[in-house]
Swiss-Prot record:
This is DNA-directed RNA polymerase subunit beta'. One of its GO terms (molecular function) is DNA-directed RNA polymerase activity. SMART domains: RPOLA_N. It comes from the Bacteria. Zn(2+) 1 binds at residues 60, 62, 75, 78. GO terms for cellular component: DNA-directed RNA polymerase complex. The keyword Nucleotidyltransferase applies. DNA-dependent RNA polymerase catalyzes the transcription of DNA into RNA using the four ribonucleoside triphosphates as substrates.
Length: 1207
C-alpha cells in the first residue's frame, strides 16, 4: 500500500492501450460470473480467481494449497496465486476489443473535445461513430476533401469510380485514423495565425480549438487515446455480487454492463472469424460501441440501458456523481467507528467542560480501552475473557470504565453542523438512563433544545487527537463566536430569568433601609427571612474589600439590594461592585451616588432615602452578556468558564425560588383599547371617502390604511408596556430577555394586528382581538395564512441555506493563513458603512482587530496613535474614533499578496480566540461558515414571529445568494459609465425615463423604467459608476465601469446590509475572504508574446508570472481584465480538479482535467481529505509535523476545587 502522507501531488491523464494492459492481471473472456451450483467464480469470467486473486485468504481455488506457508505459490492445477483475498480490491482485468470504440466523455461532453480537435461538428462525429456515414480518411484522386462525410449511396458511387484508390471508413476506426494523423505542432501554428486575422464566431471557435490542442500538446496525451482498443475492468470487490437470504443474488449494475460488453465483443469476434457480411458486422460494431457507452456513462446518449423494473443501470460515471457518489459519500465523509448517538437532556449540575454519557453507551464506546485495562489489572485473564465480562456488565467493569474515561475527552456533534461550534469536546461523566446530558450554556452554540434533539458522540483515539480535542475543542475554550468575536455562551431562558429576579428591587420589600456591617450579616438576615431578595439595604463599603473603592467611598455606606450582594459574589474580586446595568459601572467603577455618608441621613434614615430614589433596572440578558465579555477580556478563558458556571447555578437556583409562572390572570387587557380602535376606524373611513371621491389612487388608499392600522397597533403596544406592572411574570420574561418580546405581548393582551395573505401581501383588515379575548372565526382563519407560510418558508429555506454554506465552503476551503506578512503596499480605505442616513456598520467596528496600513496622528495633539502594521486593539480603535478620525487605510484580505491563502497581517486577529491569527488557521472555512450559519437565522426569523405581517423578509437569503452568485439583481439600478454632470431628465417613449449625463468629451443617455425612482437631480455632478436610480447594481457591469476596489467595497457593503438589517453581526474579514475568492481570475484580452490564450480565464498570480517572464525577455506582455465569478463558477474554476470534481459537474471537470493532464498540488483541505492525507491546516501543516505531544498538566479536577455559589 502507498503511504498517503508521503506524496505531494496527484496527476490525471488519458490512459494508452499499453498502460491499460500493464494494469491488468489477465483478460476476461467470458461473461459468466459465478457457478450457480458451486458458487465459485467461473474461470476467465468477471470474477475469475486466476485473474483477480483468491476469494479466501491464503487458499487457491481448487484447495490444493492452503495456509500462509504457501504464500506466493501459483497453483499448478487452477493457476491461482496463494495470497490475501484483499488483492481482489486492487487487481484489475481487461477486455481486448475486437473493434476500436470511442470514449463517450470525449465525444459527447460539451464542448466535444474530439470535435474541436478534428474540427468536425458533434453531429458529423455521431454519424460516423454510430455507423450512419462514412468519413473520408484519404481522398486519393477523388477530389473529395478529407473528413468529408459520405452516405452509403455516395460511398458506393465513388467506390465504383475509383476502386481501391481512396479510403473512407465508418465507426471509431475512421475517427482513430484521423486522430492519429493530427500533427499538433502544425495545428497549433495554423491556429495561432488564424487568431491574428479571425473575428467573431471564427475567433471564438479558434480559441476553443487552440485550448484543446495546447492541452494535448502540453500534457503528453495522444489524441488517439480517446478511442479505446482495450477496456479496463475494475476489481471485483468494488462491483461485488452477494448472496441474499433467499438464495438469490444481488449484484452491482456494473457487472450487467460489463456482461453486455463481453457478450457483444465475443459475438463480434466470431462474426469476423466467420467473415460475415459487412452489414451484420457493422451492426454488431455499433452495438459494441453502445454497450461501452452505457458502461462508461449510461444515459448520456439515447435511452439509458435499464435493469429489472425499468430502472436505469448505474454506470461508472454515476458511481462518482452526486451526493451518493464516490466523492461525497465515501471520500469526503465516511461513517466512523467508536461513535454513538442518543437524545439529549439538560445537565444543570455539569461543569462547563463536562457532559454526561449514559453508562451503557460509554461502555460500548470505550470497550477496547476497558478490555486492555481489565487485562492489565489482572481482573480478566485474557482479552476474550475481558470481552465476556463486559458483555455481562460485571460490577468491576464499571470501576475500570470510570478510570478509563477520566481525562479522555469525547466529541459531541449536533446535525446540522453549520459552524465550527457544532462539534465540541467534553470530558465525559457517567450518568444513569439513556440520554446524553448537555451543559445548558453550550446549547446556544449547538442551536440545540431539549425537545427531542439527538446528538452524536465520537471518541478521539490517538494521543494527538485527544490532545487536540482537549486544547482546541474543549467547550470551556470556545467561548467566543468566530463570526463576530462576541461570547456565544450567554445564559438563556431560566438562567436569565433567575439573575433578573435576583437583581430586581421593590419599593414595598420588607425592612427596606436596614444597614448591615458586612455581607455575611446580610446573608444571615436573608436566610432568616428578615430581609427579602428585593429589599434595598445599606452595607458598610469597607467590608467589601473592593480594590476599586476609593478611601473616601470606603468610609461610607453602599446602597444596594440583597440580591445584588449575592450576584456580586460570582464576579471576580478585581471588578467594581456592580450595582447598575451600565458599561460605566462594569468597566470603571461603582457610581459615586450609591455611596451615602451616614451623617447626612435624616430622621427616617436610609429608608427615607430609598423612598425618594428611583428603582434601579435589574440585569437583563444583554447586560449579562456584557459582563461575560468584560471578564473574558480581562481574565483567562478558565476564569471566564468558572464564572459562567457560577452564573448558571445562580440563575437556576433563583428562577426556582422565584417560582415564576404564567396564568391567564397575568394577561391584563388594556382598558382604553376600544377607544384607540375607534379613533383609527374614523381615520380609515376618512381615507375611504377620499378614495370614493377619486382624490387618491387605490394604491395610496391601501398604503394609508395599512399605515393607520400599524400605527394603532404601535400605540396599543406603547400603552400596554406603560401600564404593565413591573413584577408581572410575562413582563419579567420579556424584559429580561428570557423569552418573548413586546410584539408577543401585544398579541396576547392588545391586538394581533395586520396579517399577510398567502401571496405575501398584507390584508388591510386587521385582527383587532387579542388572544386573551379570543379571535372570531374569520380572524382565526386569516391568522392561519401567516402560520402556514412560516412553516413552509422554514422548510424550504433551511435547505437553501445549507446549500449556500456548502458552496461558500467549497470556494474558500483552500484559503489558509500561510505566511506572517505578504509585504503588500496597498491598503483598504474604510469608513462608516451607511445607507442614506442609516448606519449599517460603524467605523470603529470595521477597524478593531485589524492591522493599520498608515500612521495615524491625533489631529490636535499630533501624537502618534498607531503606526503601520500594528494591530488595532479595542482601546486604540476607541482612541482613533474619539480623535474624530472618520476613515483610514487598513490591511485587508482584498489587498493581500499571498499566492495561496492570506497572510497574518492582512487577516487581523482571530475572532474565535481574540488573539492574533496563527499560520495554519483555515480562515476560508471559518469565513464560509460565519456567513452561511446565520443564513439559517435569516430564514428562520420568519417562523418565530408567529406569522405577523412585516417581519417576513424578502431581501434576506435570496439577496445573499444573488450577491455571491454575481447574478443580475432584481430591481436593477442604472449606473453612469462616464464622469460628468446630469444634464437632463425627461420622459422617453414606452413610458420610460431618460437621464442624460454630459461628460468632458461625450454625452451619454441612460434609459430607466417608468416606475423606478431617480435619485439624481439636473445639474448634479456624478462620478463613474455612480447610481442614477434606486435599486441594486449589477456587479459584473460595475466591475468594468468602476474598477476592482469599488466592486469589492460594494459587495462587502451589500452583504453587510442584509445581515445587519436582520440584527446579525458578521465581521468584515469573513466577507472579504469570500469576495476575494470571487475576484481571483482575469480574462485575457491579448496574449502578447506569452503562452496565455486570449479569452481564457487565468488566475491573477499566473497572469502576473507570465507577464514578469515576458518583461524579463523584453517581449510584449499580455493584457487582461478582472472577472467576477459567482461562487459556484469560482469553485469549478479552482486550480484543484479533485476539489472541483467533488463539488459539481463531476464528469465535465474530470474530462477536462484528463485532457489537460492536470496535476493537483493538494493545497486545499478537500483534496487532502479525499486522498486521506492530513489536511494542510492547523496541526496538519508541514511546519508543525515534528511537534510531539506529552502530558504534564495537573488533572482538571484539582484546578476546579473552587468555592461553590453561596447558599
Amino acid at each position: 500500500m502507498i503511504d498517503v502522507n508521503n506524496f505531494h501531488y496527484m496527476k490525471i491523464g488519458l490512459a494508452s492501450p499499453e498502460k491499460i494492459r500493464s494494469w491488468s492481471f489477465g483478460e476476461v473472456k467470458k461473461p459468466e460470473t459465478i457457478n450457480y451450483r458451486t458458487l465459485k467464480p467461473e474461470k476467465d469470467g468477471l470474477f475469475c480467481e486466476r485473474i483477480f486473486g483468491p476469494t479466501k485468504d491464503w487458499e487457491c481455488s481448487c484447495g490444493k494449497y492452503k495456509r500462509v506457508r504457501y504464500k506466493g505459490m501459483v497453483c499448478d492445477r487452477c493457476g491461482v496465486e496463494v495470497t490475501k483475498s484483499k488483492v481482489r480490491r486492487e487487481r484489475m482485468g481487461h477486455i481486448e476489443l475486437a473493434a476500436p470504440v470511442s470514449h463517450i466523455w470525449y465525444f459527447k461532453g460539451i464542448p466535444s473535445r474530439m470535435g474541436l480537435l478534428l474540427d468536425m461538428s458533434p453531429r458529423a462525429l455521431e454519424e460516423v461513430i454510430y455507423f450512419a456515414s462514412y468519413v473520408v480518411v484519404d481522398p486519393g484522386p477523388t477530389g473529395l476533401e478529407k473528413k468529408t462525410l459520405l452516405s452509403e449511396a455516395e460511398f458506393r458511387d465513388y467506390y465504383d469510380k475509383y476502386p481501391g484508390q481512396f479510403v473512407a471508413k465508418m465507426g471509431a476506426e475512421g475517427i482513430k485514423d484521423l486522430l492519429e494523423e493530427i500533427d499538433l505542432d502544425e495545428e497549433l501554428k495554423l491556429l495561432r495565425d488564424e487568431l491574428e486575422s479571425a473575428t467573431g464566431q471564427r475567433l471564438t471557435r479558434a480559441i476553443k480549438r487552440l485550448e484543446v490542442v495546447e492541452s494535448f500538446r502540453n500534457s503528453g496525451n495522444k489524441p488517439s487515446w480517446m478511442i479505446l482498443d482495450v477496456l479496463p475492468i475494475i476489481p471485483p470487490e468494488i462491483r461485488p455480487m452477494v448472496q441474499l437470504d433467499g438464495g438469490r443474488f444481488a449484484t452491482s449494475d456494473l457487472n450487467d454492463l460489463y456482461r453486455r460488453v463481453i457478450n457483444r465483443n465475443n459475438r463480434l469476434k466470431r462474426l469476423l472469424d466467420l467473415g460475415a457480411p459487412g452489414i451484420i458486422v457493422q451492426n454488431e460494431k455499433r452495438m459494441l460501441q453502445e454497450a461501452v457507452d452505457a458502461l462508461i456513462d449510461n444515459g448520456r446518449r439515447g435511452r439509458p440501458v435499464t435493469g429489472p423494473g425499468n430502472r436505469p443501470l448505474k454506470s461508472l460515471s454515476h458511481m462518482l456523481k452526486g451526493k451518493q457518489g464516490r466523492f461525497r459519500q465515501n471520500l469526503l465523509g465516511k461513517r466512523v467507528d467508536y461513535s454513538g448517538r442518543s437524545v439529549i437532556a439538560v445537565g444543570p449540575s455539569l461543569k462547563m467542560y463536562q457532559c454526561g454519557l449514559p453508562k451503557e453507551m460509554a461502555l460500548e464506546l470505550f470497550k477496547p480501552f476497558v478490555m486492555k485495562e481489565l487485562v492489565q489489572r489482572e481482573i480478566a485473564t485474557n482479552i476474550k475473557n475481558a470481552k465476556s465480562k463486559i458483555e455481562r456488565m460485571d460490577d468491576e467493569v464499571w470501576d475500570v470504565l470510570e478510570e478509563v474515561i477520566r481525562e479522555h475527552p469525547v466529541l459531541l456533534n449536533r446535525a446540522p453542523t453549520l459552524h465550527r461550534l457544532g462539534i465540541q469536546a467534553f470530558e465525559p461523566t457517567l450518568v444513569e438512563g439513556r440520554a446524553i446530558r448537555l451543559h445548558p450554556l453550550v446549547t446556544t452554540a449547538y442551536n440545540a433544545d431539549f425537545d427531542g434533539d439527538q446528538m452524536a458522540v465520537h471518541v478521539p483515539l490517538s494521543k494527538e487527537a485527544q490532545a487536540e480535542a482537549r486544547m482546541l475543542m474543549l467547550a470551556a475554550q470556545n467561548i467566543l463566536n468566530p463570526k463576530d468575536g462576541k461570547p456565544v455562551v450567554t445564559p438563556s431562558q431560566d438562567m436569565v430569568l433567575g439573575n433578573y429576579y435576583l437583581t430586581l428591587e421593590r419599593k414595598d420589600a420588607v425592612n427596606t433601609g436596614a444597614i448591615f456591617n458586612n455581607t455575611n450579616e446580610v446573608l444571615k438576615a436573608y436566610a432568616n427571612g428578615f430581609v427579602h431578595l428585593h429589599t434595598r439595604i445599606g452595607v458598610h463599603a469597607s467590608s467589601f474589600n473592593n480594590p476599586t473603592f476609593t478611601e473616601e467611598q470606603n468610609k461610607k455606606i453602599l446602597a444596594t439590594s440583597v440580591g445584588k450582594i449575592i450576584f456580586n459574589e460570582i464576579i471576580p474580586d478585581s471588578f467594581a461592585y456592580i450595582n447598575e446595568p451600565t458599561q460605566e459601572n462594569l468597566e470603571r467603577k461603582t457610581p459615586n451616588r450609591y455611596f451615602i455618608d451616614p451623617t447626612t441621613l435624616g430622621e427616617g434614615g436610609l429608608k427615607e432615602y430609598f423612598e425618594n430614589e428611583e428603582l434601579i433596572e435589574p440585569f437583563n440578558k444583554k447586560f449579562l452578556g456584557n459582563i461575560i465579555a468584560e471578564v473574558f477580556n480581562r481574565f483567562s478563558i478558565t476564569d471566564t468558564s468558572m464564572m459562567l458556571d457560577r452564573m448558571k447555578d445562580l440563575g437556576f437556583k433563583f428562577s426556582s425560588k422565584a417560582g415564576i409562572t404564567v396564568g391567564v390572570a397575568d394577561i391584563v387587557v388594556l382598558p382604553d383599547k376600544q377607544q384607540i380602535l375607534d379613533e383609527h376606524e374614523k381615520l380609515v373611513d376618512r381615507i375611504t371617502k377620499q378614495f370614493n371621491r377619486g382624490l387618491i389612487t387605490e394604491e395610496e388608499r391601501y398604503n394609508a390604511v395599512v399605515e393607520i392600522w400599524t400605527d394603532a397597533k404601535d400605540q396599543i403596544q406603547g400603552e400596554l408596556m406603560q401600564s404593565l406592572d413591573k413584577t408581572n411574570p410575562i413582563f419579567m420574561m420579556s424584559d429580561s430577555g428570557a423569552r418573548g418580546n413586546a410584539s408577543n405581548f401585544t398579541q396576547l393582551a392588545g391586538m394581533r394586528g395586520l396579517m399577510a395573505a398567502p401571496s405575501g401581501k398584507i390584508i388591510e383588515l386587521p385582527i383587532t382581538s387579542s388572544f386573551r379575548e379570543g379571535l372570531t372565526v374569520l380572524e382565526y382563519f386569516i391568522s392561519t395564512h401567516g402560520a402556514r407560510k412560516g412553516l413552509a418558508d422554514t422548510a424550504l429555506k433551511t435547505a437553501d441555506s445549507g446549500y449556500l454554506t456548502r458552496r461558500l465552503v467549497d470556494v474558500a476551503q483552500d484559503v489558509i493563513v500561510r505566511e506572517e506578512d505578504c509585504g503588500t503596499d496597498r491598503g483598504l480605505l474604510v469608513s462608516d458603512i451607511k445607507e442614506g442616513t442609516e448606519m449599517i456598520e460603524p467605523f470603529i467596528e470595521r477597524i478593531e482587530g485589524r492591522y493599520s496600513k498608515e500612521t495615524i496622528h491625533h489631529p490636535e495633539t499630533d501624537e502618534i496613535i498607531i503606526r503601520p502594521d500594528e494591530l488595532i486593539t479595542p482601546e486604540i480603535a476607541k482612541k482613533i474614533t474619539d480623535a474624530g478620525i472618520e476613515q483610514m487605510y487598513i490591511r485587508s484580505a482584498f489587498t493581500c499578496n499571498a499566492r495561496h491563502g492570506v497572510c497574518e497581517k492582512c487577516y487581523g486577529k482571530n475572532l474565535a480566540t481574540g488573539e492574533k491569527v496563527e499560520v495554519g488557521e483555515a480562515v476560508g472555512t471559518i469565513a464560509a461558515q460565519s456567513i452561511g450559519e446565520p443564513g439559517t437565522q435569516l430564514t428562520m426569523r420568519t417562523f418565530h414571529t408567529g406569522g405577523v405581517a412585516g417581519s417576513d423578509i424578502t431581501q434576506g437569503l435570496p439577496r445573499i445568494q444573488e450577491i455571491f452568485e454575481a447574478r443580475n439583481p432584481k430591481g436593477q439600478a442604472v449606473i453612469t459609465e462616464i464622469e460628468g454632470v446630469v444634464e437632463d431628465i425627461k420622459l422617453a417613449k414606452d413610458r420610460q425615463q431618460e437621464i442624460v449625463v454630459k461628460g468632458a468629451n461625450e454625452t451619454r443617455s441612460y434609459l430607466a423604467s417608468g416606475t423606478s425612482r431617480i435619485i439624481v437631480e439636473i445639474g448634479q455632478p456624478v462620478q463613474r459608476g455612480e447610481v442614477l436610480t434606486e435599486g441594486s447594481i449589477e456587479p459584473k457591469n460595475y466591475l468594468s465601469v468602476a474598477g476592482l476596489n469599488a466592486t469589492e467595497s460594494y459587495l462587502l457593503k451589500e452583504v453587510q446590509k442584509v445581515y445587519r438589517m436582520q440584527g446579525v453581526e458578521i465581521d468584515d474579514k469573513h466577507v472579504e475572504v469570500m469576495v476575494r475568492q470571487m475576484l481571483r481570475k482575469v480574462r485575457i484580452i491579448e496574449a502578447g508574446d506569452t503562452k496565455l490564450l486570449p479569452g481564457s480565464l487565468v488566475d491573477i498570480h499566473n497572469f502576473t508570472d507570465a507577464n514578469r517572464e515576458a518583461f524579463k525577455h523584453r517581449k510584449r506582455p499580455a493584457t487582461a481584465k478582472p472577472v467576477l465569478l459567482g461562487i459556484t463558477k469560482a469553485s469549478l474554476e479552482t486550480e484543484s480538479f479533485l476539489s472541483a470534481a467533488s463539488f459539481q459537474e463531476t464528469t465535465r471537470v474530470l474530462t477536462d482535467a484528463a485532457i489537460k493532464g492536470k496535476r493537483d498540488d493538494l493545497l486545499g483541505l478537500k483534496e487532502n481529505v479525499i486522498i486521506g492525507k492530513l489536511i494542510p491546516a492547523g496541526t496538519g501543516m508541514r511546519r508543525y509535523s515534528d511537534v510531539k505531544y506529552e502530558k504534564t498538566a495537573k488533572p482538571v479536577a484539582e484546578v476546579e476545587s473552587q468555592t461553590e455559589v453561596t447558599e
